[in-house]
């Protein structure tokens, strides 16, 4: 095979298979190279805090249709997700940690959630203690915002019921308007608890094994190109 655009021949494949000693050496060197990169320029630390979110769908949406329950859960999950990234939530984290909101939104924080269950708040930083502080502050700020939103939702629901009994009450109307302005749009049946926010373990964002495998794969690919396109048969081990 003489050019990069030509198809490999059977002889080319045989040449690759015959170079097994070469592959072992290259894989070893690549793994060592990946490990060296890991220790010289290690990845950031990653810390996870957890908040348990329960939507109580049976109470909030008492229907028998699984499809409607699914859509309800999806809609409410999106609302709660937005609270996690809201300006007020991130500003509280920024005030506690010293980072700007822009920095927090630019890769410092990550959120994963299975809808009903544990929501995982991840933070990354070169320093393990800083990453732990970020994750804990974010989970705490989120919990505080949601608790406030639940209180507002409960008060708004009660005010609307009272207004239905006395629709001419101007004070109730003003109170409802004020509550609606503060409302997060979440259901009052929502329940949350801060499950993991203290003494959080820190791990590297990428493991040593991933670096070793990446280094070995990279040198193996380079070695294959060298054998196929640049080395003659007599030079192959």
Predicted regions and their residues:
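Short, disordered/basic amphipathic segments at the extreme N-terminus
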Residues: 1-27, 184, 193-195, 224-237
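Juxtamembrane loop-helix boundary motifs flanking transmembrane segments in multi-pass membrane proteins
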Residues: 2-13, 65-72, 201
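Short, Lys/Arg-rich cytosolic juxtamembrane segment immediately N-terminal
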Residues: 15-20, 201-208
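Hydrophobic membrane-insertion alpha-helices, especially the h-region
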Residues: 22-38
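Alpha-helical transmembrane segments of multipass membrane proteins
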Residues: 33-34, 218, 222-223
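Flexible, low-complexity linker/tail segments at the boundary of structured domains
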Residues: 40-57, 232-237
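Soluble oligomerization/assembly scaffold segments of membrane-associated complexes
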Residues: 45, 52, 64-65, 74-81, ...
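N-terminal membrane-entry
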Residues: 204-218
């Amino acid at each position: 095979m003489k050019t990069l655009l030509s198809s490999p021949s059977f002889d080319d494949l045989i040449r690759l298979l015959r170079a097994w000693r070469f592959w072992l050496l290259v894989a070893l060197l690549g793994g060592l190279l990946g490990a060296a990169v890991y220790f010289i320029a290690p990845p950031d630390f990653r810390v996870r805090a957890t908040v348990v979110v329960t939507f109580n769908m049976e109470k909030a949406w008492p229907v028998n249709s699984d499809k409607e329950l699914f859509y309800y859960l999806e809609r409410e999950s999106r609302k709660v997700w937005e609270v996690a990234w809201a300006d007020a939530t991130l500003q509280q984290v920024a005030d506690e940690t010293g980072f700007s909101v822009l920095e927090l939104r630019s890769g410092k924080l990550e959120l994963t959630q299975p809808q009903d269950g544990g929501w995982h708040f991840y933070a990354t930083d070169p320093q393990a203690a800083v990453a732990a502080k970020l994750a804990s502050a974010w989970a705490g700020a989120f919990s505080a915002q949601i608790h406030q939103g639940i209180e507002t939702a409960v008060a708004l629901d009660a005010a609307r019921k009272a207004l239905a009994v006395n629709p001419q009450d101007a004070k109730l109307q003003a109170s409802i308007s004020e509550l609606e302005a503060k409302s997060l749009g979440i259901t009052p049946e929502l329940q949350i608890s801060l499950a993991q926010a203290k003494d959080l373990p820190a791990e590297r964002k990428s493991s040593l094994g991933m670096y070793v495998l990446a280094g070995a794969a990279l040198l193996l690919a380079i070695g294959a190109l060298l054998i196929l396109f640049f080395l003659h048969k007599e030079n192959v081990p």
